[in-house]
Amino acid sequence: MTRRAGTAKTAATPAAAQSRSGKKSPTVSKAISLPPAAPRRARGAVPAAVPATTAAAALPQGGGEVRIIGGQWKRTRLPVARLAGLRPTPDRVRETLFNWLGQDLNGWRCLDAFAGTGALGLEAASRGAARVLLVEQDAGLVAQLHALCQRLEASAVTVRRGDGIAQLRQCAPGSLDIAFIDPPFEDSALFAPALKAAAAALAPQGFVYLEAASAWSDDELVPLGLALHRHLRAGAVHAHLLRLADAAAQPVAPP
């Protein structure tokens, strides 16, 4: 049974969350490079520029579990099924991402288009997001997400089996504060349509999180309506925080 999103608290916009830090956020920060991540499960090979044998060795491998890093469910364990293509976002990448976004996501509206273990969306819900939609195609993972949300009493989280890109396209303009885009690395045809659909649904000061096997540049992103805000590399994983191309040209206002 799909769980419905809870009643939203007074919304705190992404811009407001950043302003509480008392610091200006640069339009584009310098890329951060982290040492290679501990092995986890790979969803696929990195682009053809990297030999397949090298890619298979470099990408995260393995099942086991990951943990929610912050918020009300801090240290909660999330099972990682031994399923071909399942590649949860490494803990330290999620930690950096939510340091960028801020620890308090009170009122945010989120969509995790390729949910998998649900780590990204549940991390947002743990930090106060008002509505989180987890979209996943695999029936087994959907059942696992339903059970997990029931155990956590995660009333703000809805789990839906389906196509993440189609779900993004159904979102009204301005209805999302963040979209998490983390498709299987080998399915390169998914990236551009997902990013374009996310941009169309994004609130003016919202964000898109993109995880990929290689870095995306503004030359690739701007035609899709987005621009790079932050980037880091952790082993074979490239994490990008994106904003709407028009919004990225404007620095975040000071408090």
Residue ranges of each PLM-predicted region?
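Class I S-adenosyl-L-methionine-dependent methyltransferase catalytic core
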Residues: 1-255
